[in-house]
């Protein structure tokens, strides 16, 4: 009967420590011992770890202290405390079962030793199997953490985003799962659900490893790998010197000095004003009106004289962008220009299949593909009405979630982790169905996916390590999120729960600088979230 019970535990219990504790109790009772323990070898630090214990441990611990010296010794049947080796299939020692008894005839017989060794032998394969499973899980988790760290390290400006979002998301899910009343009383995460969500939270931005960093960090409109405002300023410097030269030439041909210098100074002032205007537009801090864009175009019509070949010293890729013959030098160039070489078209080697009607769209994406892969035209970029991103830039950034889903669906997830691709990639969907990459409706999104969306937004608003924006205080962040609830972007019910539970404060005390932690008018935030969007 004892053997049957032990076999049932070995087959049914997935957790190694729980399994060993149950088996040890049955083991000790079956051989009528007083106490016992199971020690397993830890190769990473060459030590012995007690994984299970039953009864008094004084004598057991004394024997355990000598485990490193008894590997090849046979159990002494006259000892009151005996260690039985658990050997793997290749003969190496996985651990020991240590049993303490009274030393009576029953426990000093050869039959006791043989029976105990056989029972111990039953543990080897289940232990090896569970250790293999746990090592594979540890390896998978390590890969995931390494990938998240690589993304954060790749950009000094995203800092710990891939680490902070999982912390907040798990904080919220655990709190929801503990609810016994209210709207989330029926929400429960078992161990498998929790593991899937935790790993998904770590992987939620894994596609960013494919996103050009200069686009993620694009802090000004003219920024590519560097801020091209410096090129524009150099052209203004050329015109500035041209004005000085024109002044001197005018005087040589008889124009009065005062008149020539007045004309020069007027040009100086206009150039200074025009450059300051362009520089301000480059920041992207305010909405551009039609009048502002018209002035940009007018300034861009001015010309400067280029004397040097602009196709010297180029890479093969740069050369491939020129599809027309080089004009003879010197050549008049516009002060601001959208040149053909500023445009990179989609090609057969790289053309994301994200449009709904695309027959090669295998993942249900529903996104609009911009006409070009890249467009760094100067007027085109400076004319961005709000922010610093063109439609091409925005797609390149949003494409990270497309790549996340493609990457994660290629992995052979075990059954209990098969929700990870959806959990990880739906945090950019919206409650009104206007999100991306698949325009999911609210009814298609689980509570966990809504939690990750909320955590991602709150972390982004409060993060102090982004070059393209200043960090918001907690009160500012929550009010912005309340307005996002009005717009059916975030889940209103979940957001109100988040605010009223003050989970944001628990997170803030761990991850947000003190100067950003201000007073929050919870009632005002909740009222704003509940209000209908105008």
Describe the predicted segments one by one.
Residues 1-2, 106-128, 138, 195, ...:
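Amphipathic alpha-helical "output/dimerization" segments
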Residues 1-18, 29, 50-51, 135-146, ...:
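Signal-transmission linkers at sensory-effector interfaces
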Residues 10-51, 159, 172-196, 208-210:
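Helix-loop-beta substructure at the N-terminus of cytosolic sensory domains
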Residues 27, 99, 109-127, 172, ...:
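Interdomain signal-transducing alpha-helices
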Residues 41, 48-49, 53-80, 118:
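Acidic/proline- and glycine-rich, intrinsically disordered low-complexity segments
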Residues 78-90:
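A short, aliphatic-rich beta-strand micro-motif
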Residues 94-117, 127-130, 389-391, 468-471, ...:
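Regulatory loop-to-helix N-cap segments in sensory/regulatory domains
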Residues 143-534:
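Histidine- and acidic-residue-rich, metal-dependent catalytic cores
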């Amino acid at each position: 009967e004892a053997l049957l019970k032990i076999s049932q535990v070995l087959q049914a219990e997935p957790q190694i420590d729980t399994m060993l504790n149950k088996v040890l109790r049955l083991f000790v009772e079956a051989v009528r011992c007083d106490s016992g323990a199971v020690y397993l070898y830890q190769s990473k630090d060459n030590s012995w770890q007690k994984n299970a214990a039953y009864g008094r441990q004084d004598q057991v611990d004394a024997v355990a202290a000598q485990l490193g010296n008894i590997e090849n010794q046979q159990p002494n049947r006259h000892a009151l405390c005996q260690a039985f080796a658990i050997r793997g299939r290749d003969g190496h020692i996985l651990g020991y079962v240590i049993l303490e008894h009274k030393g009576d005839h029953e426990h000093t017989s050869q039959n006791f030793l043989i029976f105990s060794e056989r029972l111990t032998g039953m543990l080897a394969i289940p232990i090896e199997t569970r250790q293999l499973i746990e090592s594979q899980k540890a390896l998978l988790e390590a890969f995931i953490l390494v990938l998240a760290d690589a993304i954060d390290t790749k950009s000094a400006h995203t800092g710990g985003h891939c680490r902070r979002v999982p912390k907040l998301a798990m904080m919220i899910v655990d709190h929801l799962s503990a609810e016994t009343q209210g709207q989330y009383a029926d929400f429960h995460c078992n161990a498998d659900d929790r593991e899937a969500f935790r790993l998904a939270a770590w992987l939620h931005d894994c596609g960013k490893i494919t996103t050009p960093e200069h686009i993620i960090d694009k802090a000004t409109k003219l920024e590519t790998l560097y801020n091209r405002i410096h090129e524009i300023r150099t052209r203004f410097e050329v015109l500035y010197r041209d004005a000085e030269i024109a002044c001197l030439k005018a005087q040589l041909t008889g124009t009065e000095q005062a008149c020539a210098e007045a004309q020069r100074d007027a040009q100086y002032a206009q150039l200074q004003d025009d450059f300051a205007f362009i520089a301000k537009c480059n920041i992207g801090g305010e909405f551009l009106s039609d009048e502002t864009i018209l002035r940009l175009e007018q300034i861009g019509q001015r010309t400067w004289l280029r004397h040097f070949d602009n196709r010297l010293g180029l890479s093969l890729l740069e050369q491939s962008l020129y599809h027309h013959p080089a004009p003879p030098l010197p050549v008049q160039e516009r002060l601001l220009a959208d040149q053909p070489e500023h445009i990179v078209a989609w090609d057969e080697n790289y053309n994301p299949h994200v449009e709904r009607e695309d027959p090669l769209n295998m993942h249900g994406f529903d996104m609009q593909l911009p006409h070009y892969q890249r467009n760094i035209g100067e007027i085109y970029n400076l004319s961005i009405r709000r922010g610093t991103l063109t439609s091409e830039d925005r797609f390149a950034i949003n494409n990270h979630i497309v790549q996340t889903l493609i990457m994660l669906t290629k992995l052979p997830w075990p059954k209990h982790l098969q929700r990870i691709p959806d959990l990880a990639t739906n945090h950019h969907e919206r409650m009104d169905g206007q999100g991306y990459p698949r325009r999911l409706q609210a009814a298609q999104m689980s509570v966990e996916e809504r939690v990750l969306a909320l955590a991602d937004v709150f972390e982004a608003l409060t993060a102090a390590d982004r070059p393209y924006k200043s960090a918001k205080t907690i009160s500012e962040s929550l009010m912005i999120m309340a307005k996002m609830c009005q717009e059916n972007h975030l889940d209103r019910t979940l957001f109100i729960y988040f605010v009223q539970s003050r989970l944001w404060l628990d997170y803030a005390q761990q991850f947000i600088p003190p100067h950003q932690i201000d007073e929050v008018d919870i009632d005002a935030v909740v009222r704003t979230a509940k209000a209908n969007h105008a």
